Amino acid sequence: MYWIYNVLLIFYWIGLIPVILYRLAFEDGFYERIKQSAGYMPASLLKKIEGRRAIWIHAASVGEIVATSPLVKEVKKEFPEAVVVVSVVTATGHAMAHRIIPEAEGIIFFPLDLPYLTRKILHIIKPITILLVETEIWPNFLRIAQSEDIPVMMVNGRISDRSMKRYKYISAFTKEMLRSIERFCMQSKFDAAHIEVLGAHTPDITVTGNMKYDQTY
């Protein structure tokens, strides 16, 4: 299944080349965004992570970033010596992260989910663990993290009815991806039941509530 996914992904990005070129020409900040997504990290971040343990937290957009803020605070309390790197997908999420997560040493754009780029960035950041906020399931990222023996946890996990139907279309692939995640901390019993049906091991699932309610900014 992974080779099919990768072929489709390559064609997808080839199709987006005209859009990318247009945005590079006319959209402020897009060059830095695509540069980071291609594996080129800011020099300031490279200095901060050199020789230190890193915890990577991925939160796609604004909603996930709101939930990530209290999580980062707790991580810094428990592991004050660790570098916290927060990755996002959207420009609005990036701006929000800078505004409400000052504790993070690095805020970056998530890499394109291509095997070479994913492996490259994992080797640069060298995270001791990865926390995925809500339902950020990226096949190559999970597979390569597992191959590098990097533990991955889903936090504030949520599986809507709509997502459930979508994942069921690729049930075998979904199950394989979920087996790359060691722990599932879900928002509700409803979400826990959904993730279990999709293939997560029951002993690895915990209901922890919604972290967005812990936000104090």
State each model region's role.
Residues 1-8, 12-22:
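Membrane-interacting alpha-helical segments
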Residues 17-217:
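Active-site and donor-binding regions of nucleotide-sugar-utilizing enzymes
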